[in-house]
Each structure stands twice: as structure tokens, then as C-alpha cells.
Amino acid sequence: VYMKPTMLVAEGSKVLLSQPLFPDKINPSVMFTFPGCGRASLIKRGHQRKLQSVLIELKQDGKGDEQVSRNSYTEPAMSNLPRDTIIEGLLASSLWTSIRTGPFSKVPDPTRQAHSLFINAMDTNQLAAQPTVVPKDGVPHFVLGLNLLSKLLQHKTYVWVGRKVDAQLKEKAFASNLKAQEFRGAHPSGLTGTDLHYLGPAGSDKLIWSLNYQDVIAIGKLFTFPSRLIPHD
């Protein structure tokens, strides 16, 4: 996965929900966080102390999970958030790691700016959950996430959708540099690589970022009510 973790906790340590687990030595500002509250019972290393796994014993009762506090914003306040604040929030919450670079699918360097951002809001894989169902109750957060992500770069942010998703997003208020592109057809028309080929392929002199619609919804929720980003049930 092109990273070198530096552990910030020891075995037996109490950990909080969304507490930093380790940064990446290659990009020290890129943080990976704990997905639950409990105790780090095992940190397994292999040859040359290569990190293999981290075992977390979650609280059994599931009540009153302690978590790292995050800033929340109203919708009008989000429209005025500067790019640096958005990046800081994504880095601290570990949602920055949901973004991938083209063509090598690495976690991007936050100090660099991509030429364009591509968001996949369709899935043509067999038996895959349809995006028209998954974000049905998350459309407002999907729109918020799109508008926040569009501030990360100066060029276009593309979101490719199927016909039904396109209908769900009509009459929504989007940033001026965001463009929706509808794709139709059987698999592999919903693959990120396939659509990138037509919209704007990556190259050695053209850095692009991409991510999926579920992560866009999570980003919208993170800045709205961060305590609900990871369910406690």
C-alpha cells in the first residue's frame, strides 16, 4: 500500500474512537485512526518489524464510547471553509486515505494539488449494491461532500453517475467547478479506470485523484456531525 507506519500506541493501551493509530513515514501528515473504542490488545509485526496487524478489543457494553472530538460546521459555514481547513479535517479523521491517486492508486501527498478529481457514483459489478439505494438518505451529505472536495483543486471535479442517480441530484446546488457526467451500459462501464479513460486519463505530468461515493457521504457527515461518522451500535 506504499506506506511505512509509525505506531503511536503500545500494546495494552486504552484507545479512543478516531484516535490516531499511526502516521505514514512517507507522508507524516497522513494519519490512520482507530475505528473503535477499547484497548489495543495486540500489535503483530513480521520480518524486519513490518507491521502486519493491530487487534483492538472493543468495549463490551458499547455505551458511552469515548472519542476524539472534531469540529462541526453549519452548511453556510462550510461554503466558506478554506482549502487548508478541509484538508486538515480529512487528515485528522483518516478520511484523506479514501482518496487515491492515478495511475498508481496511492494515498495522495496533501502538499500537492491534483489536476482533477473524479468521483465514482455508479457500480456495474455483478450483485453490487446500487448507488440509487445506498445514498438515498445520504444525498444531502453527498452534495456537501462534493462541494467540500471541489475546493481541493482549481480544475474540474467530475462525478460520474447512472441515469437514476443523476435524477436524484438534479436541482441540487453544486460548486461551479463540479461537473456531472452520465455513463450507461453494462460492466465495466462503472469502473473508475474505464471512465477515466474517456474523461481524462492520468499521466506522468497529470496527477489525478479519485474516490467512491460512499466516502463522499462520509466526508459530508464528518463536517456536519463528526460524532456520528462511525456508528456505535
Regions found by a protein language model. Name each.
Residues V1-T6, P23-D24:
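Short, structured beta-strand/loop micro-motifs enriched in basic residues and often containing a Trp
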Residues S29-R45:
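Short, compositionally biased
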Residues G12-S29, Q52-Q60:
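Short hydrophobic beta/alpha edge segments that flank linear recognition/processing sites
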Residues K4-K14:
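Short histidine-centered loop motifs in beta-beta connectors
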Residues K44-D233:
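Buried, small/hydrophobic-residue-enriched core segments of structured protein domains
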Residues S13-L17, G36, P140-N147:
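Short alpha-helical basic/polar micro-motif
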Residues M7, N27-S29, P135:
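Alpha-helix N-cap/helix-initiation motif
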Residues V1, P20, M31-F34:
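Histidine- and aromatic-rich ligand-binding microenvironments
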